[in-house]
Amino acid sequence: MSEEVGAKRWYAVHTYSGYENKVKKNLEKRVESMNMTEQIFRVVIPEEEETQVKDGKAKTTVKKTFPGYVLVELIMTDESWYVVRNTPGVTGFVGSAGAGSKPNPLLPEEVRFILKQMGLKEKTIDVELEVGEQVRIKSGPFANQVGEVQEIETDKFKLTVLVDMFGRETPVEVEFDQIEKL
């Protein structure tokens, strides 16, 4: 199977059951601390909303579509492979044929199907923001803070906003759906 070297692809990673959220957080922290943002792009836990009606009341819960697995979008290099494999809670890549062999990526149609099930699609967000514009953060720990867009990372669907904290401008990383343009 010939594969483009340096191509951004999706891989399925096996985790301890119930550790998906921890693995996602750990991996995202490792990507930042090890300067791997140019090789490891997104970590997604496949899940979907399920609505059940009990006693006449609808209750919506989020259910993991593939318990024990997370999807990681990355460029497969020795370094990115090492970072993911050695993240606490990760037991290995799916499609790896044995010790030392790199895994096969998921097929694009498989990824599209999974992301569509989650309501994500292969995120193509039309960003009508520019560096220097003022935005309000709608959710998260910095909700209702107003700041200036410092950096836009369309491939990760994140942006860096400078907010005033304790009299200093502090960069805060937020996702596109967490902000609104002023």
Swiss-Prot record:
Keywords, comma-separated and alphabetical: Transcription, Transcription antitermination, Transcription regulation, Transcription termination
Gene3D superfamilies per the UniProt record, alphabetical: 2.30.30.30, NusG, N-terminal domain (3.30.70.940)
Signal sequence extent: none
SUPFAM superfamilies per UniProt: N-utilization substance G protein NusG, N-terminal domain, Translation proteins SH3-like domain
Residue ranges of domain KOW in the record: 131-163
Gene Ontology CC: cytosol
Entry superkingdom: Bacteria
InterPro entries hit by this protein: KOW (IPR005824), NGN (IPR047050), NGN-like_dom (IPR006645), NGN_dom_sf (IPR036735), NusG-like (IPR043425), Rib_uL2_dom2 (IPR014722), Transcrpt_antiterm_NusG (IPR001062), Transcrpt_antiterm_NusG_bac_CS (IPR015869)
Keyword Transferase part of the UniProt annotation: no
One Gene Ontology term from the biological process aspect of the record: transcription elongation-coupled chromatin remodeling
Listed PROSITE patterns: NUSG
NCBIfam families, sorted: nusG
Family, as annotated: Belongs to the NusG family.
Protein name: Transcription termination/antitermination protein NusG
Source organism of the structure: Staphylococcus aureus (strain NCTC 8325 / PS 47)
Lineage: Bacteria, Bacillati, Bacillota, Bacilli, Bacillales
Gene name as annotated: nusG
